[in-house]
């Protein structure tokens, strides 16, 4: 798994004066502070970006929101965070561990973090200030005012892809642009709203973080799909008509769009390879072996 652990070393934590306890924040109040900190103005209700049921914003939820707002995905294993939405304490643990390592939570709760306690405005602003300057290992181009809150989803997808493939993409000077719909390319052309991701084969990638003024929850799939295009273009496509039974299985398992052309067939097959490898190997062995060969070829070029 790709480790999105920041390599920047925080110097010394600022001395924290003792403040009178102010009341805990609601989720909406906390998200307003985060948006204000980043200079974001939006009509969209951003409280739904986190998996939260409680009206009050806890310290652990605030830590996750702060770190996501800087486009940082701290977990060593993506499944550790996303496997069970019901186990919120487990979801937050990688964010808390990361924040404590980087000094972001120093002084919050008098150094007794107490993750389920409500977060105060002072604590939230202190954590936002301490996180300033920490960058994800792989930078995103922030074209959308909301992408700082949503880019963790894109990084979730990248974290599942082989390290060498992501490394190669960035070593070529490419960038992943977070944007909205419709996607507008550098030449000014506007894509159809059906496109939530786009790649210039000799250039960058664009991924929508919002669709119809609402968060786009499948950025991770779009990231995998576009990196699949990159792999297929750099190696060799597979003629989908040569493997009709395997193609039909992928249509049923994933979506009919994979039959659009051989480029889309490869990219969607790569999504299946990353997300459901055992199923792909069992039901589409030729496709599985082809992607394996392409990955080995790409790795050999590193």
Residue ranges, per PLM feature:
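Sec-dependent N-terminal signal peptides of Gram-positive bacterial secreted proteins and lipoproteins
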Residues: 2-20
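Feature responds to low-complexity, polar/acidic, surface-exposed segments characteristic
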Residues: 18-94, 102-121, 130-141
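Soluble non-cytosolic domains of exported or imported proteins
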Residues: 24-28, 53-60, 86-90, 114-122, ...
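Glycine-rich, acidic and aromatic/proline-enriched surface loops and short helix-turn segments
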Residues: 33-36, 40, 68-72, 98-102, ...
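A short alpha-helix/helix-coil micro-patch that ends at or immediately precedes a cysteine
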Residues: 34-38, 70, 157-169
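Repeat-associated, polar segments at repeat-unit boundaries in modular proteins
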Residues: 123-133, 290-295
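Active-site-flanking segments in enzyme catalytic domains
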Residues: 139-152, 159, 164-302
